[in-house]
Protein backbone atom coordinates (compact mmCIF):
# COMPACT_ATOMS: atom_id res chain seq x y z
CA UNK A 1 0.00 0.00 0.00
CA UNK A 2 1.45 3.36 -1.06
CA UNK A 3 1.66 6.41 1.20
CA UNK A 4 -1.17 8.26 -0.55
CA UNK A 5 -3.49 5.28 -0.18
CA UNK A 6 -2.64 4.90 3.51
CA UNK A 7 -3.11 8.62 4.10
CA UNK A 8 -6.46 8.61 2.28
CA UNK A 9 -7.65 5.67 4.38
CA UNK A 10 -6.66 7.49 7.58
CA UNK A 11 -8.26 10.75 6.41
CA UNK A 12 -11.55 9.01 5.53
CA UNK A 13 -11.87 7.14 8.85
CA UNK A 14 -9.21 7.91 11.49
CA UNK A 15 -10.91 5.79 14.17
CA UNK A 16 -11.25 2.77 11.89
CA UNK A 17 -7.74 3.25 10.56
CA UNK A 18 -6.16 3.07 14.02
CA UNK A 19 -8.36 0.17 15.13
CA UNK A 20 -7.23 -1.74 12.02
CA UNK A 21 -3.60 -0.88 12.82
CA UNK A 22 -4.12 -2.10 16.39
CA UNK A 23 -4.94 -5.51 14.94
CA UNK A 24 -1.23 -6.02 14.25
CA UNK A 25 -0.57 -6.79 17.92
CA UNK A 26 -2.08 -9.28 20.35
CA UNK A 27 -4.45 -7.84 22.95
CA UNK A 28 -5.60 -9.24 26.28
CA UNK A 29 -8.83 -7.35 25.60
CA UNK A 30 -9.19 -5.69 22.20
CA UNK A 31 -9.94 -1.99 21.87
CA UNK A 32 -13.29 -0.76 20.64
CA UNK A 33 -12.16 2.88 20.48
CA UNK A 34 -8.83 4.23 19.25
CA UNK A 35 -8.45 7.76 20.59
CA UNK A 36 -9.94 9.16 23.77
CA UNK A 37 -10.04 12.94 23.42
CA UNK A 38 -12.27 13.59 26.43
CA UNK A 39 -9.40 15.31 28.26
CA UNK A 40 -7.83 17.11 25.29
CA UNK A 41 -5.10 18.16 24.93
CA UNK A 42 -4.23 15.08 27.05
CA UNK A 43 -5.12 12.37 24.54
CA UNK A 44 -5.17 8.67 25.41
CA UNK A 45 -5.00 5.72 23.05
CA UNK A 46 -6.99 2.46 23.34
CA UNK A 47 -8.26 3.24 26.85
CA UNK A 48 -10.79 0.41 26.89
CA UNK A 49 -8.20 -2.23 25.99
CA UNK A 50 -5.53 -4.21 27.78
CA UNK A 51 -2.22 -5.38 26.34
CA UNK A 52 0.70 -7.46 27.60
CA UNK A 53 3.67 -5.57 26.19
CA UNK A 54 6.19 -8.26 27.11
CA UNK A 55 4.15 -10.84 25.21
CA UNK A 56 4.12 -8.68 22.08
CA UNK A 57 7.76 -7.60 22.30
CA UNK A 58 9.42 -10.82 23.50
CA UNK A 59 7.40 -13.93 24.37
CA UNK A 60 5.55 -14.43 21.09
CA UNK A 61 8.85 -14.34 19.17
CA UNK A 62 10.29 -17.11 21.37
CA UNK A 63 7.09 -19.15 20.99
CA UNK A 64 7.28 -18.72 17.19
CA UNK A 65 10.75 -20.31 17.14
CA UNK A 66 12.79 -17.12 16.93
CA UNK A 67 14.38 -17.49 20.39
CA UNK A 68 17.91 -17.64 18.95
CA UNK A 69 17.44 -14.52 16.80
CA UNK A 70 18.74 -11.14 18.00
CA UNK A 71 16.21 -9.08 19.94
CA UNK A 72 18.62 -6.31 20.93
CA UNK A 73 21.88 -5.36 19.24
CA UNK A 74 24.22 -2.81 20.80
CA UNK A 75 26.92 -1.77 18.35
CA UNK A 76 29.17 0.87 19.90
CA UNK A 77 31.15 3.04 17.49
CA UNK A 78 32.97 4.47 20.52
CA UNK A 79 34.35 1.21 21.91
CA UNK A 80 34.13 -0.84 18.74
CA UNK A 81 32.20 -3.55 20.58
CA UNK A 82 29.03 -5.29 19.57
CA UNK A 83 26.73 -7.12 21.99
CA UNK A 84 23.65 -9.11 21.06
CA UNK A 85 20.84 -10.39 23.26
CA UNK A 86 18.57 -13.04 21.74
CA UNK A 87 14.83 -13.20 22.32
CA UNK A 88 15.31 -16.24 24.60
CA UNK A 89 17.99 -14.46 26.64
CA UNK A 90 15.82 -11.35 26.88
CA UNK A 91 12.86 -13.45 28.00
CA UNK A 92 15.00 -14.98 30.75
CA UNK A 93 16.31 -11.59 31.88
CA UNK A 94 12.82 -10.09 31.97
CA UNK A 95 11.53 -13.07 33.99
CA UNK A 96 14.39 -12.74 36.48
CA UNK A 97 13.78 -9.01 36.87
CA UNK A 98 10.05 -9.58 37.35
CA UNK A 99 10.84 -12.20 40.01
CA UNK A 100 13.17 -9.80 41.82
CA UNK A 101 10.58 -7.00 41.73
CA UNK A 102 7.90 -9.38 43.01
CA UNK A 103 10.17 -10.62 45.82
CA UNK A 104 10.61 -7.00 46.92
CA UNK A 105 6.85 -6.47 46.87
CA UNK A 106 7.02 -3.98 44.04
CA UNK A 107 4.63 -5.86 41.76
PLM regions and their residue ranges:
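Adenylate-forming
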Residues: 4-9
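A short N-terminal helical cap/helix-turn-helix that marks the beginning
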Residues: 11, 16-32, 49-73
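Terminal domain-initiation and capping elements
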Residues: 33-34, 42
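Conserved catalytic residues of ABC-type ATPase nucleotide-binding domains
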Residues: 38
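Extended carbohydrate-recognition surfaces in non-catalytic/accessory domains of CAZymes
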Residues: 44, 48
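Conserved AMP-binding/adenylate-forming core of the ANL superfamily
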Residues: 54, 72-107
Amino acid sequence: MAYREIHAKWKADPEGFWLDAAGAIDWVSKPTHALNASRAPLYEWFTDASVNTCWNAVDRHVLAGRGKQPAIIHDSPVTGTKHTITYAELQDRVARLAGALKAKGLI
